[in-house]
Amino acid sequence: MRILVNGEGADVRGAQNVAELIDGYRMPPQAVLVEHNGVALHRREWRERALAEGDRIEIIHVVAGG
């Protein structure tokens, strides 16, 4: 299945939902913000949010600093 991740085409055959997509990128979930088709998601929604052909995902990796 092809989707857009941060504006670039991505083949995500193994990911059925947002949680599996994030797992595939090996990002710590507590440090990631996700938007799915223009809707910001809470982490508890990731497993419930199925991916479909053509979806748009924005992933923001939050880094602490000062």
Whereabouts are the PLM-identified features?
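Ubiquitin-like/PB1-type beta-grasp interaction modules and other compact soluble beta-rich domains
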Residues: 1-65
